[in-house]
Curated annotation (Swiss-Prot):
InterPro entries assigned: Papain-like_cys_pep_sf, Pept_his_AS, Peptidase_C1A, Peptidase_C1A_C, Peptidase_C1A_papain-like, Prot_inhib_I29
Active site: 168, 304, 324
UniProt name for this protein: Probable cysteine protease RDL5
Taxonomic superkingdom: Eukaryota
Family: Belongs to the peptidase C1 family.
Gene behind this protein: RDL5
Signal peptide range: 1-23
EC number: 3.4.22.-
Gene Ontology terms describing biological process: proteolysis
MF terms (GO), sorted A to Z: cysteine-type peptidase activity; peptidase activity
Length: 371
């Protein structure tokens, strides 16, 4: 009888482990698979905690997470479980987008903002962003493409990762310059955010900055270095060696700001070139976004620089293609489809409030067909 009881206990334990392992495999969310966290009706708290712990261990391995102490790991697990419940509940609502356990799943919303929000919402000293150009103002005769994706035209470099440096202002500026340089010269060159972080002293490096000030620096200081000449360190550094004779710096002639709160003008601009935008990325949905057309909670407290590299429509929902700087494990391989043509003229997350674009070699709208 003792042997029979032991065998039965071992069998039951094996069933529990197999059940938890299956739940883990079907629940870990990534941008590279088709499995999602799903709501489990009637799930008991204890079972949820057991599954969440297994998922957390798997997630740590996937994202290379190591914590300094057992106490810190427990704290991160608690945050992870809370984010998991949030994801489970939101995904059960059958929205146009999905959330997932990305690299930020062990961060509270406040912590996420502390490391990710680097766009300075204050105007530059000369208030240049208060004036805008009518270059891309729409008119009755405009016929724009139904969809645009500058990635397909080879005008977008690979997704980059700003790391723990609050340098989104540099990444968004650089992305727009890279795109325009490809359109004008035919050559896609990966440019240097570190050049701006180290040398653009009007901005604050990893402490944040303004895209307008970054454009002005590129215009007035010999262009922008390449990533090969000035590789990214995710740290503030010393400005040196940026104007060596053998450096292949990329120049721009200037930049312009789009009319504020005008998604139609933004659409016309994006039909011609990638555009820098500053958005509010401070919602939990933005933090944990995985896929689909995002129309979730979003304010207009502008704090994060991105690049708008296209637009389109999916299942009747218009969207912007937004390139982020948080690596290719966030969102759709580093991109977000953000809802377009919403009722608010500021655009979702304020995307139409503060958008700008570089100019190069007298590039103008008549050089690109929009029909």
């Amino acid at each position: 009888m003792g042997y029979a009881k032991s065998a039965m206990l071992i069998f039951l334990l094996a069933l529990v482990i197999a059940s938890c392992a299956t739940a883990m495999d079907m629940s870990v969310v990534s941008s590279n698979d088709n499995h999602h966290v799903t709501a489990g009706p009637g799930r008991r708290q204890g079972i949820f905690d057991a599954e969440a712990t297994l998922m957390f261990e798997s997630w740590m391995v996937k994202h290379g997470k190591v914590y300094d102490s057992v106490a810190e790991k427990e704290r991160r697990l608690t945050i992870f479980e809370d984010n998991l419940r949030f994801i489970t509940n939101r995904n059960a609502e059958n929205l146009s987008y999905r959330l997932g356990l990305n690299r930020f799943a062990d961060l509270s919303l406040h912590e996420y903002g502390e490391i990710c929000h680097g766009a300075d919402p204050r105007p530059p000293r000369n208030h240049v962003f208060m004036t805008s150009s009518n270059r891309y103002k729409t008119s009755d005769g405009d016929v724009l493409p139904k969809s645009v994706d500058w990635r397909n035209e080879g005008a977008v470099t690979e997704v980059k990762d700003q790391g723990l440096c609050r340098s989104c202002w540099a990444f968004s500026t650089v992305g727009a310059v890279e795109g325009l340089n490809k359109i004008v010269t035919g050559e896609l060159v990966t440019l240097s955010e570190q050049d701006l972080i180290n040398c653009n002293k009007e901005n604050n490096g990893c402490g944040g900055g303004k895209v307008e000030t970054a454009y002005e620096f590129i215009m007035n200081n010999g262009g922008l270095g390449t990533d090969n000449d000035y590789p990214y360190k995710a740290l503030n550094g010393v400005c040196e060696g940026r104007l060596k004779e053998d450096n292949k710096n990329v120049m721009i002639d200037g930049y312009e700001n789009l009319p504020a709160n005008d998604e139609a003008a933004l659409m016309k601009a994006v039909a011609h070139q990638p555009v820098t935008a500053v958005v509010d990325s401070s919602s939990r949905e933005f933090q944990l976004y995985e896929s689909g057309v995002f129309d979730g909670t979003c304010g207009t407290n502008l704090n994060h620089g991105v690049v708008v590299v296209g637009y389109g429509t999916e299942n009747g929902r218009d969207y912007w293609i937004v390139k982020n700087s948080r690596g290719d494990t966030w969102g759709e391989a580093g991109y977000m489809k953000m809802a377009r043509n919403i009722a608010n003229p500021r655009g979702l997350c304020g995307i139409a409030m503060r958008a700008s674009y570089p100019l190069k070699n007298s590039f103008s709208t008549d050089k690109v067909s929009v029909a």
